[in-house]
Structure formats: structure tokens, C-alpha cells
Design a protein with these regions (language model features):
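Hydrophobic transmembrane alpha-helices and their immediate loop junctions
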Residues: 1-167
Length: 167
């Protein structure tokens, strides 16, 4: 049974987004998100998977599907969203349209490849580790990498905040 669930946080996120009132940015943001999710859905269809639910929340869109028949099919579905974003970036850049839409596409593609479980890259790493004789070790290493990324981003954010306050 296919269902669509819309969380309150999705509506709240949209309200905040519309405060910016830059219609172009809003359109480009949703175009990038839509293309990303269509990439997942196309791969799901091509690999014989079945869509079960789409959930919209303030932290993103989650697609729940039937379990992948094998790791290759699961990987194809997980990587197809970021691949569409990166392909869109390449096409726009090579055609001379390296503006905001291209930048948003690149950012979405790279962001979704980060090794966090709620993102495509992390879900792929978790899927590859599952059932491995070294699963606990792999998960521990991934946890350390995730903490490292958070610390680096936090330091970068603090540095940027200090620079903008000093200017």
C-alpha cells in the first residue's frame, strides 16, 4: 500500500523557507529535491523494487521501499539520487549555466553522500556493513568518522561566525 505522510516539521520548514520570498531560490531548491527523489524512484522501478511510503519532514524526504533483492540493487537505488544531482551540476556547468541551480545540485549531491545513516551515503555504508563479520568494528569506525565530520563542520561554522562578526 502506497502512502504519503506529511509531518508538521515539513510545513514548518516550508513556512521558514517562504520567509525568504526569493521565488527563484525556492523554485530551484524544490527542483533539485524533486530531481533527486525522481532519481531514487527511477532506480527503484528499474531494479524491480516497490514503493511503500513517501514521508515529507523538515529534515528531508524519506522513501520507504520493499527490501532490495541484493546489495547491488540497493546501492543503485541509494546512489541514484545523488547521481542525478551531480549529473545535473555537470550538465549545467558544461553548458555555461553554472549559477545557483548548478550550485544547489552540487551541494545536494555531495551532502547526500555524507556518511550519516539518514543520508544516502550513510545508508549505503550501513547496508554494506550489515551482516559483515566485522560489522561492529565498521560501525565504530563510521561513528568516529561521523563525529569527526561534525566537529570539522562545527569548527568551520565557528570560524565563519567569528570572521563575519569581526568584519
Amino acid at each position: 500500500m502506497k502512502r504519503i505522510r506529511i509531518r508538521f516539521t515539513f510545513l514548518l520548514f516550508n513556512a521558514v523557507l517562504f520567509i525568504f520570498r526569493d521565488a527563484g531560490l525556492i523554485f530551484e531548491f524544490y527542483a533539485v529535491c524533486l530531481l533527486h527523489e525522481l532519481g531514487h524512484l527511477a532506480a527503484l522501478k528499474l531494479t524491480g523494487g516497490e514503493l511503500r511510503m513517501v514521508e515529507l519532514s523538515g529534515i528531508g524526504i524519506r522513501i520507504t521501499a520493499s527490501p532490495a533483492a541484493d546489495i547491488k540493487r540497493g546501492a543503485a537505488v541509494l546512489l541514484s539520487g545523488p547521481a542525478v544531482n551531480l549529473l545535473m551540476y555537470a550538465l549545467l556547468s558544461f553548458s555555461g549555466n553554472s549559477g545557483r541551480l548548478a550550485e544547489l545540485s552540487l551541494a545536494a549531491g555531495l551532502f547526500n553522500l555524507l556518511p550519516f545513516s539518514s543520508l544516502d551515503g550513510g545508508a549505503l555504508l550501513d547496508m554494506l556493513a550489515e551482516g559483515s563479520p566485522h560489522e561492529r568494528l565498521i560501525q565504530s569506525v563510521l561513528k568516529a568518522v561521523r563525529i569527526g565530520i561534525i566537529l570539522i563542520l562545527a569548527c568551520f561554522a565557528v570560524r565563519c561566525a567569528c570572521i563575519s562578526l569581526c568584519v
